[in-house]
């Protein structure tokens, strides 16, 4: 069976979702949102903070900043 490739956006969102990394999301209108991604699809991101969920449409997102360092890819050792 062929391996399905995953785009960078899905890889990033799935990593922060699985690791429950807190994010700051800036919208194109300047609004700043913070929370943890609980789910996402092709069109939106479900963000949770203080027991409340917000559905954010991806077309409204400008920037996403993780609250801590994260590793999405396996480390590759540099040959000496």
Swiss-Prot record:
What domain of life does the native source organism fall in? Bacteria
Mind listing the UniProt keywords for this protein, alphabetically? Answer: RNA-binding, Stress response
Family matches, as Pfam families: Hfq
Bilayer-crossing residues are none
Q: Name one GO molecular function term.
A: RNA binding
**Keyword Ligase: yes or no?**
no
Tell me the ranges covered by the Sm domain, including all copies: 10-70
Q: Which PROSITE patterns match?
A: SM
Q: Does the keyword RNA-binding apply?
A: yes
Please list the GO biological process terms of this entry. Answer: regulation of DNA-templated transcription; regulation of RNA stability; regulation of translation, ncRNA-mediated
Q: Which InterPro entries match?
A: Hfq, LSM_dom_sf, Sm
Quote the CDD domains the UniProt record gives.
Answer: Hfq
**What are its GO cellular component terms?**
cytosol
Oligomeric state and interaction partners are given as: Homohexamer.
Role noted for this protein? RNA chaperone that binds small regulatory RNA (sRNAs) and mRNAs to facilitate mRNA translational regulation in response to envelope stress, environmental stress and changes in metabolite concentrations. Also binds with high specificity to tRNAs.
Record NCBIfam families: Hfq, PRK00395.1
Q: Which family does it belong to?
A: Belongs to the Hfq family.
Q: What is this protein called?
A: RNA-binding protein Hfq
Species of the source = Rhizobium rhizogenes (strain K84 / ATCC BAA-868) (Agrobacterium radiobacter)
């Amino acid at each position: 069976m062929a391996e399905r490739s995953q785009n960078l956006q899905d890889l990033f969102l799935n990593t922060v979702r699985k690791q429950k990394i807190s994010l700051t999301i800036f919208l194109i209108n300047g609004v700043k949102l913070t929370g943890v991604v609980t789910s996402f699809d092709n069109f939106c991101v479900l963000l949770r903070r203080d027991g409340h969920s917000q559905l954010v449409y991806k077309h409204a997102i400008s920037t996403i900043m993780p609250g801590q360092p994260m590793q999405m890819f396996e480390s590759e050792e540099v040959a000496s």
